[in-house]
């Protein structure tokens, strides 16, 4: 009994209610998600698995605020993503959500250091770029790759 009580006291960090997504291709509607209800509590890990085309990427894009649902809601740490503007949604994405994309690429014409600097510049953390990139690569044991390009 105490296990259930302990779990119920943990904060809900991701909540979807009747989440639906319909893509429109011309006049044709293609349902991607129908009525997804889920709650992820603080400290929990969730794996999204299924066959190709079942809606995994759509669900993750909705959870990340990259898409707006056709119906239903997504709340991240109590914030309804559909009820906030683009700037606030970007702030939530930066501060509360992490992404690891299946296909990620460094820019092939830039060094490892320059790729890190670019990412920091895009995300508004432009101070101490060179030091931060070097420190990060050193922490990862990649300081010898500082000036190498991905190719």
Question: What is each stretch, according to the model?
Answer:
Residues 27-30, 81-98:
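ABC ATPase NBD coupling module
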Residues 29, 85, 113, 129, ...:
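Signature (C-motif/LSGGQ) region and adjacent switch/coupling loops
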Residues 64:
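Helix-to-loop junction immediately C-terminal to a conserved catalytic motif
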């Amino acid at each position: 009994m105490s296990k259930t009580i302990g779990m119920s006291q943990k904060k809900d960090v991701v909540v979807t209610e009747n989440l639906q997504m319909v893509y429109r291709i011309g006049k044709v509607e293609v349902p991607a998600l129908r009525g997804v209800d889920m709650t992820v509590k603080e400290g929990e890990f969730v794996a999204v698995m299924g066959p190709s085309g079942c809606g995994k990427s759509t669900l993750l894009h909705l959870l990340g605020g990259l898409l707006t649902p056709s119906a239903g809601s997504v709340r991240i740490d109590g914030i309804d993503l559909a009820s906030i503007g683009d700037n606030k949604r970007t702030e939530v994405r930066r501060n509360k959500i992490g992404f690891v994309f299946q296909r990620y690429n460094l820019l092939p014409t830039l060094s490892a250091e320059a790729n890190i600097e670019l990412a920091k510049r895009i995300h508004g953390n432009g101070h101490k770029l060179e030091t931060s990139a070097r420190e990060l690569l050193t922490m990862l044991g990649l300081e010898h790759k500082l000036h190498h390009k991905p190719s």
